[in-house]
């Protein structure tokens, strides 16, 4: 296959139609189009408004706790015996993951648009918690759609959302996971267009969502760049991040995309293996199609029906991926690889015991890839991994797999 011509910059997308090459766009019902266009108009104004940026930065510093530290994992590095491993500690943010970066940005946008009701979808519950948190902070009612399967396996986060005043609506259609929750949220949005803002949790969906979520999450990569230069005097050799919908990964990668010496690896959920259907590796094992308003790589059958994926991690079991990742894969700029459930579980336990950090199962997938790569690299080389969430929410799932009592 001919390699596509490399663009002058990997950081200029999307175009005015919201396309990254052949991916992205806005494939939505006619009733939603005016809303999407209104959102785009407000987003274009907000991103060029110094007051908007200043308010977001102020909230980031005093509410979220930014900048998050860049931490040299000394004992893990020694254990692996190769490249130096650094973690971008997004799990130390308020609410315990990277999700709050995007939620604060979007709730400021919702306020700017005069919306008085927030809806969101959630898989692992981290985005639901972050949405409920910012809605409480700004005094807006919040409804969170969550697949019934996820409600069951993420009980602590469901309780948190309800404590924060959000209404959690379990979705029983389909397999009761993230895709179904997103479908339900889109239905709600169409019905309540006047007063409702849909706070999407990942860098997917119709344009301008992939762009605005990426921009709100890019604070991760911007800080990392400054921090690694301060720590090492140079850029890292490799960046590694888990990809579900892809927002933590694009947030880390985007500021580095034009730095040719920095390799990037996105880690997908390989589930129980790629042979069957029990995985969520849409870039490794999927094909392009349209879902939730954008064209991207999807897990689909020969008739274009969306398959239900599986991952031990509720945050990675989305059968699609943000369109910018699809484009970066085809452009050859980022490599995407799968990690199996059992590998993520092993990585989870290793980090807990070596560094005293309990990671979420999502970044445990990224860590499993770091564990494979670091020993093959020189001791003078540097890997930065996005530790995108903490593992409190996963202790019950992990205990079940390890056959331990909680």
UniProtKB/Swiss-Prot annotation:
The modification N6-(pyridoxal phosphate)lysine is found at residue 99. Keywords: Amino-acid biosynthesis, Aromatic amino acid biosynthesis, Lyase, Pyridoxal phosphate, Tryptophan biosynthesis. It is an enzyme of class 4 (lyase). It holds the Pfam family PALP. It catalyses: (1S,2R)-1-C-(indol-3-yl)glycerol 3-phosphate + L-serine = D-glyceraldehyde 3-phosphate + L-tryptophan + H2O. Its cofactor is pyridoxal 5'-phosphate. It comes from the Bacteria. Pathway: Amino-acid biosynthesis; L-tryptophan biosynthesis; L-tryptophan from chorismate: step 5/5. GO terms for cellular component: cytoplasm. One of its GO terms (molecular function) is tryptophan synthase activity. Its EC number is 4.2.1.20. Belongs to the TrpB family. The beta subunit is responsible for the synthesis of L-tryptophan from indole and L-serine. Tetramer of two alpha and two beta chains. This is Tryptophan synthase beta chain. It comes from Chelativorans sp. (strain BNC1).
